[in-house]
Amino acid sequence: MKAFIAILSIAIVLLLIVSIKETSAKDCKQECVKRYTKGDLTNFLKAEYEPKNRGGICYCEFTCHVKFYIYLKHEMD
């Protein structure tokens, strides 16, 4: 029974980590589009998020060869 609870606890922690990363990736894409095209997704190519402690680096790339980085800061509660 203790092994089951331990495995379940680990699974929940991993699920939380994945959901935080997905949210940050969405934030990354939204920030890229908002800063360069003011919400227009026409020239958007990709956004890659690299998590760090209390924030991360967001790489933005557009089809018109525009590339830049954004530093996202996420407050930890």
Swiss-Prot record:
Which parts of this protein are propeptide? 26-46
Keyword annotations: Disulfide bond, Neurotoxin, Secreted, Signal, Toxin
Signal peptide coordinates: 1-25
Domain of life where this protein originates: Eukaryota
The record's subcellular location field reads:
Secreted
What GO terms fall under cellular component here? extracellular region
Q: Which GO terms describe its molecular function?
A: toxin activity
Q: Which body tissues produce this protein?
A: Expressed by the venom gland.
PTM annotation: Contains 2 disulfide bonds.
Chief localisation class: secreted
Is Secreted found in the keyword set?
yes
Family the entry assigns: Belongs to the scolopendra neurotoxin 3 family.
Q: What is this protein called?
A: Putative neurotoxin 1
